[in-house]
Amino acid sequence: MSDERIRQIAFYGKGGIGKSTTSQNTLAAMAEMGKRILIVGCDPKADSTRLILHCKAQTTVLHLAAEKGAVEDLELEEVVINGFRNIRCVESGGPEPGVGCAGRGIITAINFLEENGAYQDLDFVSYDVLGDVVCGGFAMPIREGKAQEIYIVTSGEMMAMFAANNISRGILKYAHSGGVRLGGLICNSRKTDREWDLISELARRISTQMIHFVPRDNIVQHAELRRMTVNEYAPDSNQANEYRTLATKIIDNEFMAVPTPLEMDELEELLIEFGILESDEQVKQLTETDKAAKESEKKQEDAEGEA
């Protein structure tokens, strides 16, 4: 199979939103349908493959390279581990917080995988990426034209929506140079008021779709405690069928958009309209977070310009 036919997708979302859980359950469902999948974990926590491999955390490329002396000394079989339904799994890894560039592991891992033929005979490559904003090394799958379809995991909570809007801003930045597109928002429900309507409206306003609404179900946590996906732990459950539905929607998805992220006042208006943003303190929190995010993006742009 040629590289041109491989669909390269990425899951982004606010920390703690359930991005890795949602992506692994969805990819497990896709594998059940016969799709050949490689997961590339792009989070220093190395938790992007644990439900597929039934382990606490897969040993990362950077850790293995440090043990061997250099990434060039590694064999592909040491890095890529097969899990549930023969899903191939890799964790890029990263340094301790505050020490070095966490995105460097992503760059190192992807280059190693490409050079050693890891992308052969695949239908999907999935990048599970840390970050409330798309910047630095964490933008690498987008910036370098690796991931072509982005799915943002969000919910009806204020900061999750703020992060989704920020991520769409990052996608827009690279849309014309790298060809990346937003495939849709995945609402990982937190059972907030009018959540379905709110995320559907957010999706409409940023020119995308809510590709699926994943209901909240305790069976997800029960499966996680056993380090399993719901599809493996309870294959006949309603929740497993929800992930199968989402998997089918992604497989069939042809709605790839260049997003139109909201300005801060537009996002505030939406949140006020749905009763999410009520107090002056909440408005202040959102404004300060937006300012910090933009300052972070500006610093990264300056650093990229100097590189």
UniProtKB/Swiss-Prot annotation:
GO BP of this protein: nitrogen fixation
Co-factor binding details: Binds 1 [4Fe-4S] cluster per dimer.
GO MF annotation, one: metal ion binding
Cofactor: [4Fe-4S] cluster
Record's catalysed reaction(s): N2 + 8 reduced [2Fe-2S]-[ferredoxin] + 16 ATP + 16 H2O = H2 + 8 oxidized [2Fe-2S]-[ferredoxin] + 2 NH4(+) + 16 ADP + 16 phosphate + 6 H(+)
Keyword hit for Iron-sulfur: yes
E.C. no: 1.18.6.1
Residues involved in ATP binding: 13-20
Cleavable signal peptide: none
Any matching Pfam family: Fer4_NifH
PTM: The reversible ADP-ribosylation of Arg-104 inactivates the nitrogenase reductase and regulates nitrogenase activity.
Assigned keywords, A-Z: 4Fe-4S, ADP-ribosylation, ATP-binding, Iron, Iron-sulfur, Metal-binding, Nitrogen fixation, Nucleotide-binding, Oxidoreductase
Residues bound to [4Fe-4S] cluster: 101, 135
Residues found modified as ADP-ribosylarginine: 104
Chain spans, region Disordered: 285-307
Function: The key enzymatic reactions in nitrogen fixation are catalyzed by the nitrogenase complex, which has 2 components: the iron protein and the molybdenum-iron protein.
Self-association state and partner proteins as the record states: Homodimer.
Family: Belongs to the NifH/BchL/ChlL family.
Alphabetized PANTHER family for the sequence: LIGHT-INDEPENDENT PROTOCHLOROPHYLLIDE REDUCTASE IRON-SULFUR ATP-BINDING PROTEIN (PTHR42864:SF2)
Protein name: Nitrogenase iron protein 2
Natural source organism: Mastigocladus laminosus
Underlying gene: nifH2
